[in-house]
């Protein structure tokens, strides 16, 4: 980047940096800084609190410890770390254009938050793949507990490998009396190393996983939409089942679209900057970056909200987590939702419904592997738990 670069020298969240530095005189009024600080503080509080509660709901309740939910824990942990270690510190650096946090933390900021971002996206992709196998190929063997842990470990290792170049070339420099945390890329003609790394990273952390999730969820949606009980009209329980399937597809589309919308402007910002560096010389670019970075970081706080709004078990978990608040009153139903049940009739009687609901995600990963060979095992406590009672009839829990 050129000397007008205001926020990309430590581009802590996704990427590519320049091998030049420059002091920037950009500043903003105190009232404007206070507004941005309030917006970022609210983001961090919501994201950290929401994702911490999601992790607690799953790990503290045996009924929620399923294969898919372990991926959700991984996703929540990554989002929590990204909000706590990336959003706040990068906001301070972007708003002041001075690095206050030392050399060691400069290395850390160019490794761990980027790793967390990669883990977040890859965890979403793993969830999509798990849902694809559970719904499109329900009789294929499912992931065991050791396999799930191996996949999660693999995600972290790949993420660390992708983030390591930025950490390796990170350094702290002095630029006209101002301390900068920069990524000093090797000298090359025309900045090809920077551009190549930038394009590869964006492809791997955005376009590729987004394409995989789009294909997976499209096939899942088509499979659910076409799957119907033969010989019966859509009324009563069948109609409710059809409505549940539609809600399931809409939820998946919402998750993918939220991710895509939050991150697309941010990536376009850096793609444009790679080809037209003079855009960073405009005074308004500081406000543009702060807005785009807030939008990208806000993706870390939406998932807990989606879980709470669209899944009754997570909603019960959130009520239990906030039971100390005077306006939140958990019920016995909330506790029962997170307590393992021993019979299907108990669930049906408690819900006072004639519908037959089944959720194979009630078993933990270790228990799921001990079932019959070829038996469909669904590890979902979130995605409207799906399973088969018979080869000709499907059930979706809402």
Swiss-Prot record:
Source domain of life: Eukaryota
GO molecular function: substance K receptor activity; tachykinin receptor activity
GO biological process, one term: positive regulation of monoatomic ion transport
Tagged with keyword Acyltransferase: no
Keyword annotations: Cell membrane, Disulfide bond, G-protein coupled receptor, Glycoprotein, Lipoprotein, Membrane, Palmitate, Receptor, Transducer, Transmembrane, Transmembrane helix
Disulfide cross-links: 106-181
Transmembrane intervals: 33-56, 70-90, 108-129, 150-170, 197-218, 252-272, 291-310
Residues with attached carbohydrate: 11, 19
Extracellular side: 1-32, 91-107, 171-196, 273-290
Gene Ontology CC terms, in alphabetical order: plasma membrane; sperm flagellum; sperm head; sperm midpiece
Cytoplasmic side of membrane: 57-69, 130-149, 219-251, 311-398
Family according to the record: Belongs to the G-protein coupled receptor 1 family.
Official protein name in the record: Substance-K receptor
Organism: Homo sapiens (Human)
Gene name as annotated: TACR2
